Amino acid sequence: MATVREKAAALNLSALHSPAQRPPGFSVAQKPFGATYVWSSIINTLQTQVEVKKRRHHLKRHNDCFVGSEAVDVIYSHLTQNKFFGDVDIPRAKVVRVCQALMDYKVFEAVQTRVFGKDKKPTFEDSSCSLYRFTTIPNQDNQLGHENKVHSPSRYSDASFMSSDIKSDSLEDLWENLSLKPASSPHIHISTRLSPQVINEVWQEETIGRLLQLVDLPFLDSLLKQQEVVPKAPQSKRQPDMVNTSNYLDRGILRAYGDSQEDEWISAAIDCLEYLPDQMVVDISRNFPEQPDRTDLVKELLFDAIGRYYSTREPLLNHLYDVHNGIAELLVNGKTEMALEATQLFLKLQDSQNREEFRRLLYFMAVAADPSEFKLQEESDNRMVVKRVFSKAIVNNKNVSKGKTDLLVLFLMDHQKDVFKIPAALHKIVSVKLLAIQKGRDPNKDTGYIYCQRIDESEYSSSTKKKTKDQLLSLLKTIDEDSKLSAKEKKKLLGQFRKTHPDIFTEYFGD
């Protein structure tokens, strides 16, 4: 795989970032510093970089939306890459509070999801299930045939710094409450736009690099070429004006029912129906209980249908079985945090289509597995029923043992809220590397994940002596305390040790 340096050279980054390529009217002298500049820069970056497109929630389409976790990822990368607050480590929780402030100041708003006619409390959620929309973009939910695409930065350029009229004092209070102080102007880096190709290459290289540190892989070919082997789930393009009217009405009935229920279980199940074929959805609608308030019958119908569909289709994560084995091995050895990070990295490498379908299914599995929820089978625990029904929908490979598959599936269910987040360490590494490219430095020097620590010659010499001494003392202690050795044998070994390492012997036993 080509290195980032080679990719950057091929794309002529130095020319891309020359003064001639800067935006019209750009001038360092014109740039404001401090709290106001940081705030405006965050808004501009969020509006131009977060993925805004048509999304679905409970089978209802919402135009021009982005998800909460992606907003946090964009702002986190922006703050760490540009070092607005110096070298201070910024935890993800503080970025979430920044997003809450952006929502409080009407930069963006939550896409309203009504439950019995009431709006949910406008609290920002770092989740891939929460939808938001910029307030500068008109609501277009009622338009049909709108393309599901990412909008260009120009769409927001005129509104980038007009989202809210906020005084500098208020912004300074905001950063102070977060224990963050904007660095002085010489340390603030003027961000220049990098090619998406370079950014994606950096993300992929660093994600794979870190994954290789956590998981022992015998072969790298499958990992490096994983984009070619990801199974593509059969997806039918269902636009309102292109589907059979009867099928669309059946989906509409289920959507209306879901919108009327204040039930997380039913909402999660209906979200999964998006991936079921039309005929299965028609069957669900036609067999719907005559008493809609019998939610137990509704849940039984939905669970059986979703389970039946995923038992017959291609597993979502069936490729890269060696990674699955590696993650399961970490779990067996009790290294849960490392297993979680490895899972986050693995899912970061997935294509967006598979990732979204897997997110919905895993969310439904986690809700259905809750022991306080609807009893799926009288004599079985919900958690075990869900594992048994959906394990093969996630991983079904003869190279992964059943025990490891079960362990991995249960782990995914228990951590479904965290597995789709990007590790903070990866964010920081990528930001540092992108900053090096922007400044024209070698991106591979002193950046990225490394497998050993660089030290100078004198430090190496002293470190070697200390390590050797520590190991010799440990060996001497083992000989001295070994009760299995006879007195004659122990005396002989101690004599040999004293002859070859008198200083260590004296230090251990004294004069």
Swiss-Prot record:
Gene3D superfamilies: Winged helix-like DNA-binding domain superfamily/Winged helix DNA-binding domain. It comes from Mus musculus. GO terms for biological process: intracellular signal transduction. InterPro entries: DEP_dom, WH-like_DNA-bd_sf, WH_DNA-bd_sf. PANTHER family: DEP DOMAIN-CONTAINING, DEP DOMAIN-CONTAINING PROTEIN 7. Belongs to the DEPDC7 family. Strongly expressed in liver and to a lower extent in kidney. This is DEP domain-containing protein 7. Residues 46-136 form the DEP domain. Pfam families: DEP (PF00610).
